[in-house]
A protein has these predicted regions:
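Short beta-strand edge/turn micro-motifs at domain boundaries
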Residues: 130-193, 253-261, 290-333
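Surface-exposed, charged secondary-structure patches
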Residues: 3-6, 89-136, 237-276
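N-terminal export and membrane-targeting signals
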Residues: 1-22
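Intrinsically disordered, low-complexity segments enriched in Gly and acidic/Ser/Thr residues
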Residues: 216-301
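Core segments of small alpha/beta cavity-forming domains
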Residues: 40-92, 167-236
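Primarily mature extracellular domains of secreted and cell-surface proteins
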Residues: 48, 68, 75-76, 80-84, ...
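Bacterial signal peptide processing site
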Residues: 32-35
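C-terminal motif of bacterial Sec signal peptides marking the signal peptidase cleavage site
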Residues: 26-30
Length: 333
């Protein structure tokens, strides 16, 4: 469903002489050597980013055609890896011979939003057209060290008209926004907690979110579609995702706000008056542990991209642009 990333290829000619020059310069001036952990540098070379996207596409096509989750794990991580990995695992259980009718994913008309960053992990965004539909895909690639391969951690799907206007610095690089201490209405690192509080309590949980299908609409769907009956009761639980395993990332927009990618976790438990629970979805059955005598609980991960306004933008609220929720496991009791 998504694309994958290659190991960057770095030129090695004249490495020794360049290192020697850098050492002499630092000895004379007292500066520090420019490493990813010490200085503000581009997250990825402009020639390496396309190679990462190409590698991603190659591996994800192989993984999806063979239905091999171990291949998928080589190029995906975070929310995207959790959702796609579980999906491929389930489809493999139901189709162990693979997917011979799979149509390869291809990317085109790509631009790369590369921030300059200090320290690790590093990340960048590919904004690309794809062979699946007419929408734009935003893929966030990340890695924890120079020795690691780039892996995609987020996918967001936007109509061309939804793409915001990104800010750039004096050198043309995208401008990253930290997870805290910003001038935004909601700090990027707090979005998961604020959003899940809203889902549980409405405006009592948070008043930061604009009405829409993934906010007021989702709460209304839970109240109506899953209203309790004499035969079945449905319960929901929502919580922010681990900020290390599912790190949020954000880019500054020209209007002073930010585009933020973040992750949440969700549970839906259905308990029946008289069991056993009949599960008709083969993918749920493939991921099920335990015996659903009276109840089944679905565990899901959701990846979201939102526009967060500046705190000074009076009356503005957080707006959802895309949300992808996927089943990662299920249990019966």
């Amino acid at each position: 469903m998504t694309a994958r990333a290659p190991l960057p290829i770095r030129p090695r000619r004249r490495l020794s002489s360049l290192a020697a020059l850098a050492l002499l310069a630092c000895t004379a001036t007292g500066c520090v050597t420019v490493h990813g952990a010490d200085a503000v540098v581009p997250a990825v070379g402009k020639a390496d980013a396309p190679a990462a996207l190409d590698h991603f596409a190659q591996v994800v096509n192989d993984a999806d055609s063979k239905l091999d989750p171990s291949l998928n794990a080589q190029v995906e991580t975070g929310a995207l890896g959790a959702i796609d990995g579980a999906g491929i695992k389930a489809r493999h259980v139901n189709s162990p011979s693979g997917n011979p009718g799979y149509q390869p994913l291809r990317f085109s008309d790509t631009r790369f939003l590369i921030p300059r960053e200090r320290g690790w992990p590093k990340w960048f965004v590919a904004d690309t057209a794809n062979s699946r539909d007419r929408d734009r895909w935003l893929l966030v690639f990340t890695r924890d060290s120079v020795k690691d391969a780039w892996r995609a951690s987020y996918l967001s799907v936007l109509a061309p008209g939804q793409l915001p206007d990104f800010a750039t610095d004096g050198q043309g690089y995208a401008v990253p926004v930290p997870v805290g201490g910003t001038d935004l209405l909601v700090q990027p690192g707090e979005l998961g907690a604020r959003y899940t509080a809203y889902l549980q309590q409405g405006d009592k949980g948070s008043t930061a979110f604009a009405q829409g299908s993934q906010t007021s609409g989702l709460r209304a769907q839970r109240r109506t579609q899953y209203a309790p009956t004499s035969q079945v009761v449905t319960q929901f639980a929502d919580e922010p995702a681990d900020p290390v395993q599912y790190a949020p990332v954000a880019l500054r927009l020209r209007d002073g706000g930010a585009l933020v990618f973040f992750t949440t976790r969700h549970e839906m438990k259905q308990t029946v008056a008289k069991g056993p629970v009949v599960i008709k979805d083969p993918n749920v059955n493939a991921l099920l542990t335990g015996t659903p005598n009276r109840s089944v609980t679905l565990y899901k991960v959701a990846e979201q991209v939102v526009k967060v306004p500046a705190r000074s933008d009076a009356g503005a609220k957080v707006v959802f642009l895309n949300r992808i929720e996927g089943l990662v496991s299920a249990s019966g009791a």
